[in-house]
Amino acid sequence: MNYREAGVDIEAGRAFVGDIRSLVESTRRPGVLGGLGGFGGFFELPSGYRQPVLVSGTDGVGTKLKIAHQVGRHDSIGIDLVAMCVNDILTAGAEPLYFLDYLATGRLDREQLTAVVQGIAAGCRESGCALLGGETAEMPGFYEAGEYDVAGFAVGIAEKSELLDGSQVQLGDVAIALASSGVHSNGYSLVRKVVANSGLDWTSSQTIFEGQSLGDVFLTPTRLYVKPILAAKAQKIPIHGMAHITGGGLPENLPRCLGPNQTVAIDLESWKWPTVFRWLAKQGNIADSEMFNTFNMGVGLVVIVPAAAETQALKFFKAQGQTAWTLGEVVTGDGTLIGLP
């Protein structure tokens, strides 16, 4: 008996590294030292920082993977993975530098996992960060054949004096929403339950989605906010705080970027729920409060700016191609958002 007969194909693993080498190289940026294949990745910190602080984050894409497996589409999952990590560290005011991935599978399917890495590389290029390395684990008996899981790790850099930790947020500041691209990568256990109970499948198309299949709608990749936020910082738009709206929706995530005894009064009339959320609520008979506590509801990122910079910030983000609007105002409170169902 040998290792391959036990379910682990080392030769296929080597070939896979060759398959993705050019994808990894396509993400190369200043600071990367060496290439793929070492025991660790090397990155030289950029000059020009007085007190550089490294900011790190890790995440996955949850059960959105189940839909990718059922539909057989894997090219967008990597974008989700990068976005979930870099959007998180972005909220601290950090510029993403590099990214690492972990792929675990029951049996190495080179074509399938190359598609995943294509998405990771695309997300890294869009975010200006290098895919510095990763790990691919073949784990027979742990995952079913054809199934895989992914995790990502992002590292960024910020000037210590410019870190966003809630202390800069002031009463009277305004909360500006940047639109999400859809459900992003949270709430998919509920999404899958709604679709299963509806008797539909992922190939079903709905008139409300203009002929798109449910698979296409719910595999829409998570939006990356790195470019517009770094551009805003370069233009000296004063950002006091940011929140990435992920699991737990606005109620869970927006208070994380505020200071003590602060909350946000939300203007529910300031935006209309995107179609995908209206469909989920109706199809699943989901209460409004549950929708807001589970999904982003069309708000992917919230940027807190002083009231005097509201018009400037809105104009700038719209010029960057973002759908942006004033979501609410920072007021006195205990962190419980005001105005939500």
Curated annotation (Swiss-Prot):
Pathway: Purine metabolism; IMP biosynthesis via de novo pathway; 5-amino-1-(5-phospho-D-ribosyl)imidazole from N(2)-formyl-N(1)-(5-phospho-D-ribosyl)glycinamide: step 2/2. Its EC number is 6.3.3.1. It holds the Pfam family AIRS. Its main location: cytoplasm. One of its GO terms (biological process) is adenine biosynthetic process. InterPro entries: PurM-like_C_dom, PurM-like_C_sf, PurM-like_N, PurM-like_N_sf, PurM_cligase. This is Phosphoribosylformylglycinamidine cyclo-ligase. The lineage of its organism: Bacteria, Bacillati, Cyanobacteriota, Cyanophyceae, Synechococcales.
